[in-house]
């Protein structure tokens, strides 16, 4: 409940929070989404097993992913599979050259963003993920070696957490969060970050 209040204060109306509170909310928002959504799915799967049928797994420790592609293999698997099978592959997937592959990724993730909501903020969220995947493909194409696994996990988590900013109520609210963090002069009480560190240590 405590962290729900912190997150609601940052992701709701224009935030009037310390830098520590905003940072804690940014780093925890996706974890709260994951535990809530995955928890409901796990209960549904358990109920299904009790009734004699098996529902597919929809989350597979997404925050253990060491790159963004792996994150999407683990996060909301039913949605990512649908996007792959019915949008990305019909567009040509990776079969029509590197440039077309990049365009297909951007289109697929733009539509993924729109699936989550009709606002411009959700479109930007989808395009951020698509652009990041294109960037990673470009790095791989020129022979850049992957990061150390622990650093890769950290960077993936930070990027995903940053992108969740655009799940705020609207694009102006998302901009307000970014602006409030940039303008914050007082870091504030670090107790939120201390508790957050314990939570993240348990997850990772």
Regions from the PLM with identified roles:
Residues 1-202:
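Membrane-embedded transmembrane alpha-helical bundles that form the catalytic cores
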């Amino acid at each position: 409940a405590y962290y729900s209040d912190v997150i609601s204060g940052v992701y709701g109306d224009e935030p009037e929070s310390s830098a520590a509170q905003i940072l804690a909310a940014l780093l925890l928002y996706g974890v709260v989404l994951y535990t809530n959504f995955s928890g409901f799915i796990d209960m549904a799967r358990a109920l299904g097993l009790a009734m004699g049928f098996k529902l597919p797994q929809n989350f597979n420790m997404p925050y253990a992913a060491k790159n963004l592609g792996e994150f999407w293999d683990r996060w909301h698997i039913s949605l990512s599979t649908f996007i792959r099978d019915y949008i990305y592959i019909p567009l040509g997937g990776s079969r029509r050259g590197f440039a077309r592959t990049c365009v297909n990724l951007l289109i697929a993730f733009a539509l993924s963003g729109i699936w989550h909501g009709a606002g411009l903020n959700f479109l930007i969220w989808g395009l951020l993920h698509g652009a990041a995947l294109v960037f990673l493909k470009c790095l791989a194409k020129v022979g850049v070696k992957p990061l150390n696994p622990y650093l890769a996990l950290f960077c993936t988590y930070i990027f995903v957490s940053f992108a969740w900013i655009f799940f705020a109520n609207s694009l102006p609210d998302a901009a307000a969060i970014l602006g409030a963090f940039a303008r914050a002069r007082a870091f504030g009480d670090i107790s939120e970050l201390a508790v957050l560190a314990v939570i993240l240590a348990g997850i990772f």
